[in-house]
């Protein structure tokens, strides 16, 4: 009998916990975590040079595609030709905030100032159904020495 009471009490507590964990949004609809937001393909590409046009290797490029809430970004690094490239499939966004930072100090041509720019994706393929389309995010950046 004691075991039956413990089982019933535990079941009652579990039901209370599950009900209290429900998250609702302002429209009084249950929070949607099913991933129904269309996903788009983005090809982030570009080149970083100094003011004389020489490529700069080892520059950290952060492609921030946050749309308000959680900070969402990908980190890339320039190669010996100053180029960076990354393919990503993410929910549809209208802009990327790109940052370019010299993280290796005097190596690769000296100390360079950081730079921040906004880039609007350019559509290369139309959306269809659950597919949000394809886009290119391109940036050619010159960095000044410090």
Regions from the language model: what does each represent?
Residues 103-136:
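Structured interaction patches on ligand/partner-binding surfaces of diverse proteins
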Residues 69-83:
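Short, acidic Ser/Thr/Gly-rich low-complexity loop/linker segments typical of extracellular
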Residues 44, 50-69, 90:
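Short, ordered, surface-exposed loop/turn motifs in non-cytosolic proteins
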Residues 22-43, 47-52, 145:
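Beta-strand-rich domain onsets/edges
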Residues 85-97:
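Short Pro-Gly-centered beta-turn/loop motif in secreted/extracellular proteins
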Residues 1-21:
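Sec-dependent bacterial lipoprotein signal peptides
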Residues 38, 132-146:
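Conserved "repeat-terminator" motif of extracellular CCP/Sushi domains
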């Amino acid at each position: 009998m004691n075991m039956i009471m413990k089982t019933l009490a535990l079941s009652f507590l579990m039901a209370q916990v599950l009900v209290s964990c429900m998250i609702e949004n302002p429209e009084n609809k249950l929070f949607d975590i099913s991933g129904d937001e269309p996903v788009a393909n983005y090809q982030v590409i570009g080149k970083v040079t100094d003011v004389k046009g020489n490529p700069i290797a080892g520059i950290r490029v952060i492609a921030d595609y946050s749309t308000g809430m959680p900070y969402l970004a990908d980190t890339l690094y320039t190669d010996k030709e100053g180029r960076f490239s990354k393919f990503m499939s993410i929910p549809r966004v209208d802009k990327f905030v790109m940052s370019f930072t010299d993280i290796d100090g005097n190596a690769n041509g000296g100390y360079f100032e950081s730079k921040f720019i906004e880039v609007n994706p350019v559509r290369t393929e139309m959306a269809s159904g659950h597919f949000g389309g394809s886009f290119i995010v391109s940036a050619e950046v010159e960095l000044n020495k410090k």
